[in-house]
């Protein structure tokens, strides 16, 4: 009963919002739809430009400041009399965050953009094992000896015992909860 009451009130609210549009709202939407995407216009405009470096003048192009490691620099203006001078600067909070974080390392991509499946050989790609149920599989290597006595490594993507225990406990808990509530 509560469920149907909630959705009926929600439906009426959405219906009211749809029917309460005025002609001005519709004109604004038509204007927005008639122009090309705002983002693509900005990208087309800025493709040919080079950015303005930090501590250089940006009076003529206030949105052309370069990007730091993480954040974009801002054009800060100072007015003296009738003239106004603007310089690309970095905000203090951005400077503190960038100095604390440093360079953001790019995550290494797998060789063929696919992960190594469970129990497959991962000797060459030890960090690219696929994700299991909740956790990512880990590459585990074992020492093997041939008939000649030569040592070789046998590597495979496996799930550690702790991860198996946690996933098993969650499966059992989910089943118990489902059985209790009749699902």
Curated annotation (Swiss-Prot):
PTM comment, free text: Cleavage of the propeptide depends on the processing quadruplet motif (XXXR, with at least one of X being E).
Modification Tryptophan amide, positions: 181
Location (main, coarse): secreted
Disulfide bonds, paired cysteine numbers: 51-66, 58-75, 65-88, 77-86, 115-130, 122-139, 129-157, 141-155
Prodomain positions: 21-47
Record region (Predicted alpha-helix): 164-177
Highest taxon of source: Eukaryota
Family: Belongs to the neurotoxin 19 (CSTX) family. Double-CSTX subfamily.
Name of the protein described by the UniProt record: DELTA-miturgitoxin-Cp1c
Organism: Cheiracanthium punctorium (Yellow sac spider)
């Amino acid at each position: 009963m509560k469920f149907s009451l909630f959705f009926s009130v929600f439906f009426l609210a959405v219906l009211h919002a749809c029917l309460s549009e005025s002609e001005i709202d519709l004109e604004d939407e038509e204007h927005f739809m008639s122009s090309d995407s705002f983002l693509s216009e900005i990208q087309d405009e800025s493709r040919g430009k080079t950015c303005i470096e930090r501590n250089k003048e940006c009076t003529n192009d206030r949105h052309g400041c370069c990007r730091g490691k993480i954040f974009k620099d801002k054009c800060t203006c100072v007015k003296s009399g009738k003239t106004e001078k603007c310089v690309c600067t970095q905000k203090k909070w951005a400077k503190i965050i960038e100095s604390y974080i440093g360079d953001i390392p790019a995550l290494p991509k797998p060789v063929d953009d696919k992960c190594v499946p469970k129990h497959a050989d991962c000797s060459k790609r030890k960090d690219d094992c696929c994700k299991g149920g909740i956790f990512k599989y880990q590459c585990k290597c074992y020492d093997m000896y041939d008939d000649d006595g030569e040592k070789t490594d046998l590597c495979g993507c496996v799930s550690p015992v702790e991860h198996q225990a946690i996933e098993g406990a969650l499966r059992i808990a989910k089943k118990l909860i489902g059985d209790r509530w009749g699902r």
